[in-house]
Amino acid sequence: MARFTRWLRRNIDAVLALLISVVVGILALADVLGTEEDQINAAILIVLALLAATLLRDRRSAAQALESASAVRLLSGLEVSQAHAEARHATELWIFKGGTGTYLRAVTLKECIEIARREKRLLRVQLEVIDPTDEALCKAYAQFRSSLAPGPDGTGEEWTLVRTRKESFATILAACWHRQRCASFLTIDVGLSRTMTTFRWDVSSRYVIMTQEDPAAQALMFEKGRPYYDAYNRELVSSFRQAKRVHLDNVGELQLSDEPTIEETRRLFTQLELELPASFSERDITDIVRKALRAKNPYP
C-alpha cells in the first residue's frame, strides 16, 4: 500500500489526465456534455491543462537540479586566485587547513587583516598547519611536494625538510606578530596537525575553497547556503579540535619588534613550547622571520 501511495504521488498528473479522459468518455457516451464537439473540446482543454502543469513541474525540477549542480564550482588557473580575492572581501572569518601556509602568509592573512581594519570589522582566524617539530611528518611533506614538481617552486626554493620546518614555524610567528598588532579586532588561533594533508582548505564567511598542492590541479568552491559549505566547515572545526594547540597566550609580555630579532624569535618559540631545532643557525632563524613577514607568493 505504501509503495502504491508513493507511486501515485509521483505520477498524480498522469493519473488525473487518464481519469478525466475516462470520465469525459463515459459522459460523452451518456450524452451529458451536449454535442460531441463540445465534449471533445472540453476533454482536450483539460488534458492540455494537465500537460502544462506537468511541464511546469518538470521545469522546476530541472531548475532545482541545475541549482544543485551549480553549488560546486570548478576553478582553474587564474580563477583560483580570483576566487580567493572574492572570498577575502567583507569576510569576518578565515579558516585555513593545509601544509605550511605559504600562500596564507604571502597574501591571505595580510589582505584579510587590511580589509578588516579598513572596514572596521572584527576578524576571526583559525589556522591549522603541519607540526614543525615533527621531523618525520615534515620530511614526508617535503618529499610529497618535491614529487609533484621537482626543482624550485614559485618562490624560487626547493622543498626540503629544512624548508618545510621553516615555513611552518614562520606561519606560527606570523600569527603571533599580527595578533600583537591587531589585538583590537583580530582573534587568531593556531593548531598543529599530526598528519599530512594533500589538500588545502580556505573558509570565509561566504565560501569554502578546496585546492590541491599541485597548482596545475583544479580547485573546488562551495558557496554558503549551498550543499557542503556547512559540512566542510564542521570538518575543519573537528580537525582543529584534534590538532595540537599552540597557546599563543603563553607569549606573555614578550613584545615582538617590527622586525623580530633572533633572540626574540628564539624566546617566542621557547615560551610556546615549540623549541627550534638545535641545528638551526642564526641565518635559519632570520629566514623564518623573513618568511613570516615577507613571504613570497608561490603562485604569482
Predicted regions and their residues:
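A broadly tuned preference for mixed-charge, low-complexity surface segments
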Residues: 2, 6-10, 142-156, 247-273
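Low-complexity, flexible helical/coil segments
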Residues: 127-139, 149, 160-167, 224-229, ...
